[in-house]
Each structure stands twice: as C-alpha cells, then as structure tokens.
C-alpha cells in the first residue's frame, strides 16, 4: 500500500518516507496475547540492541526505527516502522524484518530482553506509572480495550498479575518464538505500507 503526506514547499523530500510492516495479532480479548506482544515489542524493537531495530539501522534504513502495538481495537495490530527512510528501500525493509524474525525463531529470543520487557510492563502496572497521564484515565482506557467488545469482560486487562507470572514461566519455553512464527511470519492478515512526502 502506498500513501502520501503533505510537507511544506521548503521541506526536502529526500529520505522522508515512512515504511511500516503490519500484522493483525489475534483479538484484544486474549489477555495473554495482549501482554505478550507488548513484551515482544520491547524485546524485538524497543530495547537497546533489539534485533529487528539493529538490523534495520545497520542496513541504513531510516534514521529512527520503532515498534507499535495497537491493542485498543478488536483485532490488535503489531507494526515495525522506519521513519525518514527512502521509498526505494521498501522491499529491503520487509526482507530484513522477515529474515531477522526467522533467525530469532531459529536461535531463540534473548531471554534477558523478554524478562526486562515483562518487568517493565509489570512495574508500570503495579506502580500505576503512566507518566503524565492520570492512572484512573489509563485504567479506564484499558478497561475499554476489552469492554467495548464483550460486556462480561471489562476488567481482564486490569487483572493481569497472573498473566505476568505465566509469561515469566513462558520465557523458558518456545512460547514467544511460536508467537513470532504464527503472528508475524506465517500470518497473511497484514500489510506493508509506504508513506511518501508530497509538496
């Protein structure tokens, strides 16, 4: 998919393209997936030296690479994004992501990165550490992530301490590698998007 965004006449069009690789991940009522992909975002792209981010930076694709996990919709979307890339790098961007993910599945994810991701998520939850946002507001929004789609499950994303404990145990299994294989590599419900600047 290709799209455009507006820039001013004074802005350069060179290396101002956004590239994204997006996959739909289950549904928001699955509390394990809801937390697991937040952890995978950290382990694959957000942490220092994360494999997908490092591979894209080493290839010179974009001047910033980040992940996004949008779980506030019935079918959550997990994305890898390269900012300020070149449109001609779109195929290489997708290839590097897929090859890096295949290597991660084959050799295993860094267990320390997974544990750090779990610890970070659990700390934020326990301490209600949401930065500048009031905790009541964020708790309410977390309730809406499930409540909008099932009136009987408004609190599943607030009752997550058991989920964190289970994820901690799953670090020593191939659970996370299977998630990558199923939802990021074998999954055809997704898109690759190139957004180019236009004056």
What are these regions (language model features)?
Residues 173-174, 198-199:
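Extended non-catalytic domains of envelope/secretory-pathway proteins
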Residues 15, 29, 33-34:
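Disorder-to-helix initiation segments
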Residues 177-180:
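Conserved functional hotspot residues or short segments at active or partner-binding sites
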Residues 15-26, 53-168, 188-198:
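M16 family metallopeptidases and their MPP-like homologs
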């Amino acid at each position: 998919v290709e799209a455009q965004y507006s820039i001013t006449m004074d802005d350069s069009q060179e290396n101002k393209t956004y590239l994204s690789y997006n996959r739909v991940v289950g549904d928001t009522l699955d509390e394990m997936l809801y937390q697991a992909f937040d952890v995978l975002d950290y382990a694959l792209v957000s942490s220092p030296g994360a494999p997908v981010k490092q591979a894209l930076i080493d290839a010179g694709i974009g001047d910033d690479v980040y992940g996004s996990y949008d779980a506030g919709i019935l079918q959550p979307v997990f994305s890898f994004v390269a900012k300020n890339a070149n449109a001609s790098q779109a195929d290489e961007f997708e290839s590097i992501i897929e090859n890096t993910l295949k290597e991660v599945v084959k050799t295993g994810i860094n267990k320390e990165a997974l544990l750090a991701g779990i610890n970070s998520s659990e700390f934020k939850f326990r301490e209600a550490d949401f930065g500048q946002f009031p905790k009541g507001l964020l708790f309410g929004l977390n309730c809406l992530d499930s409540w909008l789609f099932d009136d009987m499950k408004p609190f599943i994303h607030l009752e997550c301490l058991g989920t964190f404990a289970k994820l901690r145990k799953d670090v020593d299994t191939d659970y996370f590698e299977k998630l990558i294989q199923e939802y990021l590599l074998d999954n055809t419900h997704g898109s690759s998007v190139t957004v180019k600047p236009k004056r």
